[in-house]
Regions:
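Extended surface/linker regions that mediate inter-domain or inter-protein docking
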Residues: 126, 146, 154, 158, ...
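Bacterial N-terminal signal peptides
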Residues: 30-43
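Aromatic- and Gly/Pro-enriched helix-to-coil junctions and flexible linker segments
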Residues: 46-226, 322-328, 335-374, 385, ...
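Beta-strand-rich ligand-recognition modules
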Residues: 273, 279-340
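Long, ordered, helix-rich scaffold segments
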Residues: 422, 440-465, 476-558, 728, ...
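Sequence context surrounding c-type heme c attachment/ligation sites in exported
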Residues: 48-97, 104, 111-117, 312-313, ...
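Short, low-complexity, charge-dense intrinsically disordered segments
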Residues: 15-26
């Protein structure tokens, strides 16, 4: 049979399938005429055209809805018959809910007569149009207020940019933070970002560790010296204390614990002498933080002062002096006669940090203090207020009020003392700033100026925070703060310019990493354990490559300003040798010097895809295919649901209770194909309505196994049939034709992605009143060639993003 190529065209938002010979021959005149007639017929019958309510819509409602939602019976207090004006505001909620119920096949009930595909489409088109027309007569709605706590991911990135402290596997104070919840697919949703007592405890501990790591708290006024007399030392082994004297009668240690605020070089000194006039020779060591600096004591009853330079870390360390057993015997062998008497220790001193200057301060310290220190012209209290005002404005992402500066300066004053360094005295105030609700939450307090919907337009600082956490998952930078302070950021032109600048910044990788992984639902791959017997070992290197691929695709589309349709299908992907083997792809060769290095071979790189690769876009990446599979086998339902939810924005309702899952065919021993099993499952009327939407999509992806490899036979060794018929009668065969169908529905995909990004950026579940904004965003994106950067920019410029509703009084943070 001659192979055909399949193309999809869209007429009035409805896909139409055209098939052409694989050799690309043009259609005959007769075939072209037939298609032209079909296209004109489609236009004439009005695919997507708005039907007349009284003549076309009301009869459908009467036939399918009035029995349960009419004058005689009004279940749920829904009565379609009593509507006198279908385009009046009171009907808006009813039509919006009806649209959702019909779109998700929840209404009419499965045991009632069902509309045909054409009737359902006609109803949905009218309902959507009715909601839009009603919305056009009402003021815009910014949506319910959301008080959003920083997620763990945002907290780490904010601390990095605020404090200049890098987080890695060796230093991550957020490790024990409670896991963030998720709602509407994203952990940025304010509904799940509460604070528990465990959060408070962890925030305090994390802030203290970060501040200690970031700032130099001692040494800027000169090295500090600690001195401990003999009686203040702890003894161990042959070390003794008697009448205020410390001495060794045998090998042992004399130590003192000290808290080092600043890592660096220190000088450790000890005053040591023999206790009598006998000649002696003994091996000792100055000890600090498990390090030993050895020295030999050879004197005749005289006091010896010895010192060594030693590097110490920040934190609690043990310093002191040790009399070493092993060296004692060897040293005595060379002495004149056996060792007699005692070794006496008068005192120990520690001085440091040494050689510390303002020029040598770490970047993290400069970010916190901005070069501000007390001087002859600036008192310590004045310097503290300057630091608090400057650092606090960055921490709170807005200027502090005079009362706030006074409050935190009071915390400094309570700690301040002549013997305490300025930086050390500032620590409690810095900690208080970092555990304030105004740092941990993105607070948008009420103001006097109201917008059209009774809410408020965001000021420059609030808008800057929304923008930076949307694109960077972190705080605004200096340029964005400056735009906010000048008032320019609320202008369309400046807001657009800043958005483009920030998308070009490396920090925008957070959007790909944080948004894309949640939108695609691939975080579960981190813990996905496919059955080894069937799929082999999913090693760490391969798993990392699998997780990186869709993120890099999303990032590349942003970086190159490509069409968002490349998320559906593209002629490139990202892979390394590990992923190339999984996909059976031949990667372009690396230069000889790179080929020899394993690290280079494992780097992900952009590669072109051959026409028969069956890859391209994110749907056919191993990450998505694993996330929508079971550990032992594929799942038509999960894959179909994934496409409906994440590409088309039409998720099915939750499954009916007590409906059994499909068994594992390889284990059950049945010879039924997947298609035969699904047909049996769909015989249950509780399952049929949803499965008729999900299963065809899953069938089209059946050539991919549970870890994303291409195959021709399924787990039970049955030949795979990847043909599928959708509810509207459209037929597709395999993933390539499915992608073409999805491309024909590019406006649905654009609208779905717009809704997902808006949900992520606003931190709340989408509401019916968001439909108007989503429609405007997706329409503007389509006009500009479906560019992903345009979609993001239009979201930033949208009414919901730039405005908010009133915050209920019980949500206002009162703590400073």
């Amino acid at each position: 049979m001659e192979r055909q190529r399949v193309f999809y065209v869209t007429i009035n938002a409805r896909p139409l399938i055209l098939r052409m010979n694989a050799n690309g021959h043009r259609l005959t005149a007769g075939a072209a005429l037939a298609i032209a007639v079909a296209l004109l017929s489609c236009a004439a019958t009005g695919f997507g055209a708005e039907p007349d309510f009284a003549r076309e819509i009301r009869p459908l409602l009467a036939h399918y809805c009035f029995d349960c939602h009419g004058a005689k019976k009004a279940k749920g207090d829904v009565n379609f018959e009593r509507l006198s004006n279908p385009l009046a505001m009171p009907a808006r909620k009813l039509w919006s809910e009806a649209h959702s119920q019909i779109r998700h096949d929840e209404m009419p009930p499965h045991d009632k007569p069902q509309p045909t595909a054409a009737e359902r489409e006609r109803l949905l088109a009218w309902l959507e149009s009715a909601v839009e027309r009603i919305d056009a007569t009402a003021p815009p709605n910014a949506g319910r207020p959301v008080l959003r706590r920083l997620t763990r991911y945002e907290y780490r990135r904010t601390m990095r940019d605020l404090m200049g402290v890098e987080f890695d596997f060796q230093f991550d104070p957020t490790t024990d933070f409670p896991a963030d919840g998720s709602d509407a697919g994203f952990d940025t949703n304010g509904a799940v970002l509460g604070v528990s007592p465990i959060h408070i405890e962890q925030y305090l501990q994390a802030a203290e560790r970060i501040v200690n790591r970031a700032i130099v708290s001692d040494g800027l006024d000169g090295p500090r010296t600690w001195r401990w007399e003999a009686a203040e030392l702890a003894t161990g082994g042959g070390a003794k204390l008697d009448a205020g004297r410390a001495f060794f009668t045998a090998p042992g240690r004399l130590t003192r614990e000290v808290r080092i605020e600043q890592a660096g070089e220190y000088s450790l000194r000890a005053m040591v002498r023999s206790a009598d006039d006998n000649k002696m020779k003994a091996q000792l060591a100055l000890v600090a933080d498990a390090k030993e600096e050895k020295f030999t004591l050879t004197r005749n009853g005289k006091e010896v002062r010895t010192d060594r330079k030693i590097k110490l870390p920040a934190g609690r360390v043990q310093v002191g002096i040790a009399y070493l057993y092993e060296q004692q015997e060897k040293a005595n062998a060379a002495a004149e006669g056996p060792m007699q008497g005692e070794i006496s220790v008068d005192s120990i001193e520690l001085t440091g940090p040494l050689n510390l200057s303002a020029d040598a301060l770490p970047e993290s310290h400069r970010r916190v203090f901005a070069g501000i220190r007390p001087t002859a012209e600036r008192t310590r209290q004045q310097a503290a207020k300057e630091v608090i005002a400057k650092f606090g404005a960055r921490a709170f992402r807005r200027p502090l009020t005079a009362d706030e500066v006074k409050h935190y300066a009071g915390i400094f004053a309570a700690m301040d003392a002549p013997e305490v360094s300025f930086e050390r005295a500032m620590k409690p105030a810095l900690l208080a700033l970092l555990v304030s609700p105004h740092f941990l939450y993105r607070v948008e307090p009420d103001r006097a100026a109201r917008s059209a919907d009774g809410g408020y337009s965001l000021d420059g600082y609030e808008l800057a925070s929304r923008l930076s956490y949307f694109l960077w998952s972190s705080m605004p930078d200096d340029e964005l703060f400056a735009a906010a302070a000048s008032g320019k950021l609320t202008d369309d032109a400046e807001l657009t310019r800043q958005t483009h600048r920030m998308l070009a910044d490396p920090r925008a990788s957070a959007l790909a990493q944080n948004f894309a992984t949640q939108w695609l639902g691939i975080r579960s791959v981190e813990n996905f354990q496919p059955e080894k017997k069937r799929f082999g070992e999913l090693g760490t290197a391969l798993r990392n490559a699998v997780l990186q691929e869709p993120v890099l695709i999303f990032q590349d589309i942003l970086d190159r300003d490509l069409s968002l349709l490349a998320l559906i299908d593209a002629d490139f992907t990202f892979a390394n040798e590990d992923l190339g083997k999984l996909y059976k792809l031949t990667l372009p060769p690396l230069p000889d010097e790179q080929q020899k290095k394993e690290g280079e071979r494992r780097k992900m790189r952009r590669i072109p895809l051959p026409p028969d690769a069956h890859r391209g876009g994110v749907m056919t990446t191993a990450a998505v295919l694993m996330a929508s599979s079971h550990p032992t086998h594929t799942s038509l339902v999960k894959r179909g649901k994934w496409v409906l939810d994440n590409f088309l924005g039409t998720p099915p309702p939750p499954p009916s209770p007590n409906v059994p899952a499909l068994p594992d065919r390889a284990e059950s021993g049945e010879k039924l194909t997947m298609r035969q099993q699904v047909e049996q499952h769909r015989a249950d009327p509780n399952c049929a309505a949803c499965h008729k939407r999900m299963d065809p999509i899953g069938f089209a992806l059946e050539n991919f196994d549970a870890i994303g490899r291409w195959r021709d036979k399924d787990e039970s060794k049955q030949t795979i049939d990847a043909t599928a018929t959708l509810p509207d009668g459209t037929t597709v065969n395999g993933p390539d034709e499915l992608k073409q169908l999805l491309l024909a529905r590019k406006d649905d995909f654009t609208r779905c992605l717009a809704e997902k990004l808006l949900t992520y950026s606003l931190g709340r579940t989408p509401e019916p009143y968001d439909l108007r904004a989503v429609k405007r965003i997706s329409t503007a994106t389509a006009r500009d060639g479906y560019k992903l950067t345009t979609l993001i920019t239009e979201i930033v410029k949208s009414y919901p993003f730039r405005n908010r509703a009133l915050v209920p009084s019980n949500l206002h943070p009162t703590s400073k």
